[in-house]
Amino acid sequence: VGYGQLDWKLRNDPRVVVMERTNARNMEPDWFTEAPDFASMDVSFISVKLILPGIYKSLREGAQAVILVKPQFEAGRGRVGKNGVVRDKDTHRQVVEDTARFALDTGFSIRQIDYSPITGPKGNIEFLLLLGKSGTAGGTEVLADIPHIVDMAHGELA
């Protein structure tokens, strides 16, 4: 539902479909003239879990998606600290694992998990999931890397 956030160069790229002022929770394949090859998601004040199913349905087979996981919007109110900042490593681990497992349950494969080198405006550590739509879910072995990735993020950014 947001608008005015997309970089000007991307906004003017003919390969990019700009969908401002659109509630992505309702995404359906018929929103697109052809199934997208790629999706990126950076949402606030809503869980990515509410949008992932629509992205999965809309992407073409073989497509990829990069999802920015913001723990402050995934953890639940009881686990978010002062000023909306999540600092707890265990909360980060659980949020990344829960989101990755949800992506797997949706049908995505997990190609890679990493932390964002850029923190959110209030200093929140955020994480990236590279997902694939390949017809068969896979990538559960990547889940074992989550504790190490969270530790690296805290070492670099906390």
Protein language model regions, located:
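A short glycine-rich, Lys/Arg-flanked "PGG" loop and its adjoining helix->strand segment in the class I
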Residues: 49-66
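Short, electropositive alpha-helical surface patch
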Residues: 29, 53-56, 121-134
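Flexible, glycine-/basic-rich loop-and-beta segments that form/coincide
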Residues: 125-158
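Conserved S-adenosyl-L-methionine
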Residues: 107-119
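S-adenosyl-L-methionine
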Residues: 2-50
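Short, glycine-/aromatic-enriched active-site segment of Class I SAM-dependent methyltransferases
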Residues: 71-88
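Residue-level signal for inorganic ion chemistry
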Residues: 6, 70, 123
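Short alpha-helix
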Residues: 92-106
